[in-house]
């Protein structure tokens, strides 16, 4: 379409994760059909989100207070699970199988050779010292593996028990389509 306003909105909507050109066009035309009040509510929700959501001072969990409800909850056990994002942690929380606390690192280490000391290192070391077990739950990407190994080394240096989530074959998968690294991990982590 050759309309600068629609094209500009489509361009900006495509910056959202998982939104391609088709989805951005759909959202744009949906918004055009809405009355001004409804569009304003959406805009205000986004502005309020940016103004009021911040990181917990202890664990970096995104929420609206200086200290998140997980950190304040004294009934949680002495386990700490480390994630890259708050949304990853929430997915695990919704399972209802974990009653510990969380730490969000936000930035993965991208390259072993050029690994500068991550900004979160000191905060993690300080916070993790309060727990009996640290569980690393980063995505199994190359950067996730590099970061997991780094975290394991720095936390074991201060005598903390560190474990990682097991990796292996996903349910409903076929071995023929599984990459060699995942096959190897599933073999090594067999029960």
From Swiss-Prot:
A zinc finger (C4-type) spans 56-71. The keyword Cytoplasm does not apply. SUPFAM superfamilies: Recombination protein RecR. One of its GO terms (molecular function) is DNA binding. Pfam families: RecR_C, RecR_HhH, Toprim_4. Residues 78-170 form the Toprim domain. One of its GO terms (biological process) is DNA repair. Gene3D superfamilies: 3.40.1360.10, RecR Domain 1. The keyword Membrane does not apply. Keywords: DNA damage, DNA recombination, DNA repair, Metal-binding, Zinc, Zinc-finger. Belongs to the RecR family. May play a role in DNA repair. It seems to be involved in an RecBC-independent recombinational process of DNA repair. It may act with RecF and RecO. This is Recombination protein RecR. It comes from Mycoplasmopsis pulmonis (strain UAB CTIP) (Mycoplasma pulmonis).
């Amino acid at each position: 379409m050759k309309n600068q306003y629609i094209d500009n909105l489509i361009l900006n909507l495509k910056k959202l994760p998982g939104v391609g050109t088709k989805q951005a066009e759909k959202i744009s035309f949906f918004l055009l059909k809405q009355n001004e009040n409804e569009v304003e509510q959406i805009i205000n929700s986004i502005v309020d989100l940016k103004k009021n959501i911040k990181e917990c001072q202890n664990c970096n969990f995104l929420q609206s207070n200086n200290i998140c409800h997980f950190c304040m909850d004294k009934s949680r056990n002495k386990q700490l699970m480390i994630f890259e994002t708050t949304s990853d942690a929430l997915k695990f929380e919704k399972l209802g199988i974990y009653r510990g606390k969380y730490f969000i690192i936000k930035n993965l280490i991208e390259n072993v050779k050029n690994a500068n000391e991550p900004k979160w290192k000191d905060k993690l070391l300080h916070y993790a010292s309060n727990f009996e077990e640290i569980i690393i739950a980063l995505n199994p990407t190359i950067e996730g593996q590099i970061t997991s190994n780094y975290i394991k080394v720095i936390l074991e240096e201060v005598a903390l028990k560190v474990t990682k989530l097991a990796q292996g074959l996903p349910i409903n998968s076929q071995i023929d389509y599984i990459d060699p690294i995942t096959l190897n991990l599933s073999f090594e982590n067999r029960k």
